[in-house]
Amino acid sequence: MTDTDRIQINEARIRAEFDELARIDSESFGEREMADRLKEKLAELGIQAKEDDTAEKIGGNAGNLFGTLKVGLSGTPILLSGHMDTVAPGIGKKPVFHEDGTITSDGTTVLGADDLTGVIAILE
């Protein structure tokens, strides 16, 4: 079995994850709820997240999250990176899932997918 054979992407789980996280208000400098939820999700995966003091330095309410997963393999470590914030208008986001597989906002806010999709890929 190859590594590719072991990869199992669960589309329903990804869509549900996107729906949940996209609905969290996380405009720049106001990512506290998103940071707390991501810490919970990382903990569910056995990853302890640490938060730095960036919030204090920039006038925000959440710092950067760092999680380390030790897998016991030799080789070069890799870094996965994403951001938690969205641009305005991003309060009260409502993702709309279309039959063709696309996801859009309801038109009253941004969708906030620019890096939420990256965050979800990291969680997956």
Question: What feature does the model see in each segment?
Answer:
Residues 2-32:
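N-terminal capping segment at the start of a domain
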Residues 4, 8-10, 68-70, 103:
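Hydrophobic alpha-helical segments, principally membrane-spanning helices and signal/leader peptides
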Residues 15, 19, 36-39, 119-123:
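Predominant activation on well-ordered alpha-helical scaffold segments within soluble catalytic domains
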Residues 16, 41, 90-94:
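Extended interaction regions within the primary functional domain
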Residues 27-74:
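A non-catalytic alpha/beta surface segment that caps or lines the substrate-entry region
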Residues 61, 68, 74-124:
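Active-site metal-coordination/substrate-binding segment of hydrolases
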